[in-house]
């Protein structure tokens, strides 16, 4: 909604434009009227809509055509004033003033217009019969108000309707010629209906209607008011009420009725409560509230976020089998402009016979939050988190402390850990990721797939952690400055092909050797005969030289579910990186031996000194 309103008064000379402004401000009819009133600003606290309002007068005698065009360009709404006792001023509305305001607008939004029939004190009847054909011809005309500056009749109402035309415009909502909601409005209201339909029975119960009413307007409907609403719908819409519940058709009809009766602010209140702008698009503030993620920090869903997305899951799991079928998932995504999760989903999380279980669903949310928190905020926005939870979705996100602090303290508080699986093409990275999801080669899709992610939970010292595996090619890391940052690096080589180890060794030296990221070399295809290195150190010798854990053999051959031991090891290394270095540093063994020798020597010296003291005392 706009933060201020600029109203421009136009019309023929002597129709009373200036008198209307002065009567509003002075609350009495002015005895002397200047050719043009100065621009006035009405403070927000004295206007019904609580928005500051600027009122601008126009005088054809004092202002040029260029100044007029500039004022029209700046105006949010134009009041075309005519004299109800002068037919000629009414005709000028059609032939002069409306073409001046919107004549150059062939496409896009037009400036809303309020017709103002002044000097009603000089005419006994109404001018509406003459004005109605003009209102029918020009859809940008919001309404017509007859008033009298002399008698102060309808002066406040005039400027209220002008404000309303800006803050609650009819044009984006309703097509007066077709007498129906515009498609964008119907689409937005349909999404709101689906979010409010908590049991997904395609209708709003009294409880759901009251929750909706309270969310939008601050108070529930009285029982009789609820019955009256349903009665009106029943009389006008076939199928608008089903089993005493309001259907989507009934909901859309009610909003159409509000607009037709001039209460379009009601529909706008609903739309804005659910995040819509004047253009009937979800606002940036609604979809992406401010959240600061400093360098070295990561983002995770907190308990509020997990509770919300789990409620959404349970809402759409209509058969209560603990998993979302493709149809149920499509229902969940119906409030999005497009499905947010693509065909890569089955390769990213655990699924069950084409269905998405709660565990895999929560894993996917965790992955999106970690990799792209802006997308996560947007997804929560489309699901109505800010409205349904009455707080912006940044409250559902935890920003972790800097990784540097984790390294200093020797442990991490993070629940989500990132492992980059690095290796040359063909070493089995994709198979490794799928093995993490419990799929052996017998259950995997052998078609070529782009590098991706896999996420699952792993137990680390009795705590559940989310481990993300990210597939990275060695060529990319060696040829570019691609970000190699992660919590643990899994350097994978083909144990049957000695050449593939050289790629991993180069990546280690280039990116990880001088850093604090724990690394684990993995020898894939362990079911095949081990290759013999032609020259250079063997993988085991390389790891000993660089104080790294010994290479771990791995194979996912066969239909059985692969072992999870290696994934637990990776997660533990990521959670406690200092333990890796402490246990493997050769100096620690040397130091232990040295301390043993020194300890024995100190004990001998102390014993000898004690002996001398005892001898002297005798």
UniProtKB/Swiss-Prot annotation:
It comes from the Eukaryota. There is a cross-link at residues 96, 119, 164 (Glycyl lysine isopeptide (Lys-Gly) (interchain with G-Cter in ubiquitin)). Ca(2+) 1 binds at residues 197, 199, 201, 208. Mg(2+) 2 binds at residues 430, 471. Belongs to the mitochondrial Rho GTPase family. Ca(2+) 2 binds at residues 317, 319, 321, 328. GO terms for biological process: cellular homeostasis; mitochondrial outer membrane permeabilization; mitochondrion organization; mitochondrion transport along microtubule. The chain crosses the membrane at residues 593-615. Residues 184-219, 304-339 form the EF-hand domain. One of its GO terms (molecular function) is GTPase activity. GDP binds at residues 426, 428-431, 525, 527, 556. Atypical mitochondrial nucleoside-triphosphatase (NTPase) involved in mitochondrial trafficking. Probably involved in control of anterograde transport of mitochondria and their subcellular distribution. Can hydrolyze GTP. Can hydrolyze ATP and UTP. GO terms for cellular component: membrane; mitochondrial outer membrane; mitochondrion. Its EC number is 3.6.5.-. This is Mitochondrial Rho GTPase 2. Residues 1-592 are cytoplasmic. GTP 2 binds at residues 426, 428-431, 525, 527, 556. Its main location: mitochondrion. The Miro 2 domain is necessary for efficient ubiquitination by PRKN. GTP 1 binds at residues 16-19, 59, 118-119, 121, 149-150.
């Amino acid at each position: 909604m706009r933060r201020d309103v600029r109203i421009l008064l136009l019309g023929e000379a002597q129709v009373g434009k200036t008198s209307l402004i002065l009567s509003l401000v002075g609350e009495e009819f002015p005895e002397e009227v200047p050719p043009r009133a100065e621009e006035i600003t009405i403070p927000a606290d004295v206007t019904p809509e609580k928005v500051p309002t600027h009122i601008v007068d126009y005088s054809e005698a004092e202002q040029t055509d260029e100044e007029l065009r500039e004022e029209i360009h700046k105006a949010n709404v134009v009041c075309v004033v005519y004299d109800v006792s002068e037919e000629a001023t009414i005709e000028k509305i059609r032939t002069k003033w409306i073409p001046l305001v919107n004549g150059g607008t062939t496409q896009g939004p037009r400036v809303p217009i309020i017709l103002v029939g002044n000097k009603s004190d000089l005419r006994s009847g109404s001018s509406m019969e003459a004005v109605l054909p003009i209102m029918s011809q020009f859809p940008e005309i919001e309404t017509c108000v007859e008033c009298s500056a002399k008698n102060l009749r309808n002066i406040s109402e005039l400027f209220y309707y002008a404000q309303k035309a800006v803050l609650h415009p009819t044009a984006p909502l309703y097509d007066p010629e077709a007498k129906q909601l515009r498609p964008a409005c119907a689409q937005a209201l349909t999404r709101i209906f689906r979010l409010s339909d908590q049991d997904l029975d395609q209708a709003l119960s009294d409880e759901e209607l009251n929750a909706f009413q309270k969310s939008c307007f601050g108070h529930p409907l009285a029982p009789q008011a609820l019955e009256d609403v349903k009665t009106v719908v029943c009389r006008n819409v076939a199928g608008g009420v089903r089993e005493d519940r309001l259907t989507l058709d009934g909901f859309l009809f009610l909003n159409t009725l509000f607009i037709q009766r001039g209460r379009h602010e009601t529909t706008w209140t609903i739309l804005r409560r659910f995040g819509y702008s004047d253009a009937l698009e979800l606002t940036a503030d609604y979809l992406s509230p401010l959240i600061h993620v400093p360098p070295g920090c990561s983002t995770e869903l907190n308990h509020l976020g997990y509770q919300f997305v789990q409620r959404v899951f349970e809402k759409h799991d209509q058969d209560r089998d603990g998993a979302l079928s493709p149809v149920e998932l499509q229902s969940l995504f119906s409030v999005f402009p497009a499905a947010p999760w693509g065909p890569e989903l089955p390769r990213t999380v655990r699924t069950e016979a084409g269905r998405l279980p709660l565990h895999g669903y929560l894993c996917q949310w965790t992955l999106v939050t970690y990799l792209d928190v802006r997308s996560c905020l947007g997804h929560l926005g489309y699901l109505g988190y800010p409205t349904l939870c009455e707080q912006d979705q940044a409250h559902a996100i935890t920003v972790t402390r800097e990784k540097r602090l984790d390294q200093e303290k020797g442990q991490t508080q993070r629940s989500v850990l990132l492992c980059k699986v690095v290796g040359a093409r063909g070493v089995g990275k994709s198979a490794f990721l799928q093995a993490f999801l419990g799929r052996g080669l017998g259950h995997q899709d052998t078609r070529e797939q782009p590098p991706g992610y896999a996420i699952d939970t792993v137990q680390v010292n009795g705590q559940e952690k989310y481990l993300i595996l990210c597939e990275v090619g060695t060529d990319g890391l060696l040829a570019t400055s691609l970000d190699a940052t992660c919590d643990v690096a899994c350097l994978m080589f083909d144990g049957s092909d000695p050449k593939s180890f050289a790629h991993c060794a180069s990546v280690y030296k280039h990116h990880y050797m001088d850093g604090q990221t724990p690394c684990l070399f993995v020898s894939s295809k362990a079911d095949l005969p081990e290759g013999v290195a032609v020259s250079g150190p063997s993988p085991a010798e390389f790891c000993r030289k660089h104080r790294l854990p010994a290479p771990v053999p791995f194979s996912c051959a066969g239909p059985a579910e692969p072992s999870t031991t290696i994934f637990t090891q990776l997660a533990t290394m990521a959670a406690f990186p200092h333990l890796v270095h402490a246990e493997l540093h050769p100096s620690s063994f040397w130091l232990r031996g040295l301390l043993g020798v020194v300890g024995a020597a100190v004990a001998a010296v102390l014993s000898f000194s004690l002996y001398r003291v005892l001898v002297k005392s005798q």
